[in-house]
Amino acid sequence: MSVVLIVEDNDKNMKLVRDVLQFKGYQTLEATSGREGVRMAIELLPDLVLMDIQLPDMDGVSALAEIRAHPHGRKIPVFAVTASVMPHDQKRIEASGFDAFISKPINVKSFVETVGRFVAARKERSE
């Protein structure tokens, strides 16, 4: 079973993403802050991290940089998940090294397809 770490501080968004992923057969882990997300990503090595950009203690871009600084963290796909769709924000996010960008509100169909593609590719590379 593939494991997805959700880093999200909004309870409603967390519940939606968790419920969709669990319905599709993924195991989910949850973190409500950037620092907790970094720690869990490095310690638990999930198949995918879904990282909110605006978090209370550390933004998602900074959290990604810390994950990528760790040798094992370079191999984990990390998606930016954000409601911020301003062009300058999106360019900054894309330049940060995220593997994909998912905008809120989430389109469930495309979200599930994107997650599935990345998890399958990661599983193939690790075999």
Map each language-model feature to its residues.
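C-terminal output helix
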Residues: I106-G116
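Short amphipathic alpha-helix used as the core "switch/output" element in two-component signaling
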Residues: R39, V61-R74
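Conserved acidic carboxylate
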Residues: E8
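Acidic catalytic/metal-coordinating carboxylates
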Residues: K12, S33-E36, D59-A65
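Short hydrophobic/Thr-rich beta-strand motif most characteristic of the beta2 strand and flanking loop
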Residues: G25-T32, M40, I102
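The feature encodes the CheY-like receiver
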Residues: P56-D59, R74, M86
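Charged docking surfaces used in two-component/phosphorelay signaling
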Residues: K15-F23
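Active-site residues of response regulator receiver
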Residues: D52, T82
